[in-house]
């Protein structure tokens, strides 16, 4: 085979390999740092952008509030950072659905110390499904930026907080779930949580 065709064939292989390599490592930003494009707020609590950060804050009604993606996500790796101010009781919902202003689904807890951050809670259902070992509570840095990773595949959820594996849980009901990703602010008032660097990789 002439060298010209060998070079062309090699170039094609390089392009194809690069395409698949990029596709396997590409993460999509769910928050653009400028506005709430791609998200829908539910409830009367405050959701706004400040200095490139997404902020949720208790509103006048001090009720539950949610910010949900317009798109649904089934199997994925979600990575984000959060910083709790004041109470800091919040959460990240996966495969969540909406009924009026009520968001149901499975919540990865984001809460003050000794309140099981990284555990899984089923809202409007069975309640706590799994809580992290209390010895792992030290992974939470209250008042500082925390890195959370959530992996959802089929019926299984695994969570990490600042590099510490918090839980791994498998459940048929979760496996059958369909819906979007939602951030939550707890009721009760006096809550403020900052979010940034929210990225997803669909699997």
Region locations from a protein language model:
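Bacterial N-terminal signal peptides that target proteins for export
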Residues: 2-12
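Bacterial N-terminal signal peptides
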Residues: 13-22
């Amino acid at each position: 085979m002439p060298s010209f065709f060998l070079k062309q064939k090699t170039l094609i292989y390089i392009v194809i390999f690069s395409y698949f390599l990029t596709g396997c490592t590409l993460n999509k930003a769910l928050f653009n740092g400028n506005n709430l494009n791609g998200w829908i707020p539910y409830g009367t609590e405050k959701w706004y952008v400040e200095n490139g950060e997404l902020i949720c804050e208790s509103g006048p009604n001090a009720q539950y509030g949610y910010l949900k993606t317009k798109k649904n996500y089934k199997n994925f790796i979600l990575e984000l950072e959060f910083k709790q101010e004041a109470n800091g009781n919040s959460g990240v919902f996966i495969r969540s659905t909406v009924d009026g202003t009520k968001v149901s689904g499975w919540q990865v807890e984001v809460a003050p110390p000794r309140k099981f951050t990284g555990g899984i809670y089923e809202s409007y259902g069975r309640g706590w499904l799994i809580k992290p070992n209390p010895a792992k509570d030290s992974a939470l840095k209250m008042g500082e930026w925390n890195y959370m990773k959530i992996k959802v595949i089929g019926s299984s959820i695994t969570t990490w907080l600042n590099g510490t594996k918090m839980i791994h849980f498998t459940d048929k009901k979760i496996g059958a779930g369909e819906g979007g990703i939602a951030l939550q602010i707890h009721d009760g008032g006096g809550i403020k949580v900052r979010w940034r660097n929210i990225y997803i990789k669909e699997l």
